[in-house]
Amino acid sequence: QTALALAQLPFALEAKTEEELVQLMAGAASALREAGCALVGGHTCEAKELGLGMAVTGYMPGGSKAAMRKDALQAGDALLLTKPIGTGTLFAADMRAKARGPWVIDALQSMGTSNGPAASIVHEHGALACTDVTGFGLAGHLLEMCRGSKAFVALDLEKVPLYEGALDCLRMGITSSLQPANVRLRRAVANHDAVCGHASYPLLFDPQTSGGLLAAVPKARANACLEALRSSGSAPLAAIIGEVTG
């Protein structure tokens, strides 16, 4: 596996820019090495804000048939989520100096955890369908899987893991700027009127940064998969949040 980097550095004195680039690339190379990937080149430019993007190449052992896909949900599968949700509202609150330090620290620690080990575990336990939860929120990415698989799912809102402080931020009326666009997906929720009053319901549409994996695992192996995720330390807050109903 190899990666090419696009680094965007803020305008500054040359010495300052060089130091930022060294630190940025050192961190990126370290994370890539942990994933068995080599940084082989890239491009650097100056802009108003710091930014870093990667173009990564890799291969799938066993070929494409071994890949976990978005469109492979099967009736009876259990839905597992490997990380809590709520980063959107937490960091929107942090920008307003409304989030408590421990909330942000806990979220950052989770965000810094690679999904690689968790992906291996769910694959070993028979997962055929899997995606990562990012900007479209849990509801948006689950809807992608449902549409691609022509399937229906049932979620248990009480089981969805939340970052500490996420509900507090919601109570303050703070949400991400991307939340309104994601909320439009509520039309896909069959019983919206019955569940929209649940405290954590808005977090289904909360955009995630470095979110966890949403995987469908055969029901008979779901509990063993959950235990493996938690005991390995790769996903200590993983949870079974629902099932594929048809």
Indicate where each model-derived feature is located.
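Short, compositionally biased
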Residues: F91-A107, S232-A235
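Short, contiguous, pocket-lining structural segments
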Residues: E46, G86, D106-S114, C130-T134, ...
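Short pre-catalytic strand/loop immediately N-terminal to key active-site residues, enriched for Gly-Thr
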Residues: P102-S110, L128-A129, S200-F205
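Glycine-/charge-enriched secondary-structure boundary and capping motifs
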Residues: K16-A38, C45-L52, E124, T131-G246
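Hydrophobic faces of well-ordered beta-strands that scaffold small-molecule active sites
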Residues: A3-A5, A129, V153
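Glycine-rich anion-binding loops of enzyme active sites
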Residues: T2-R100, G242-E243
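Active-site glycine-rich loop that binds ribose-phosphate moieties when present
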Residues: A55-A67, P102-V122
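Short, hydrophobic/aliphatic alpha-helical segments
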Residues: Q74, S114-A127, H198-A199
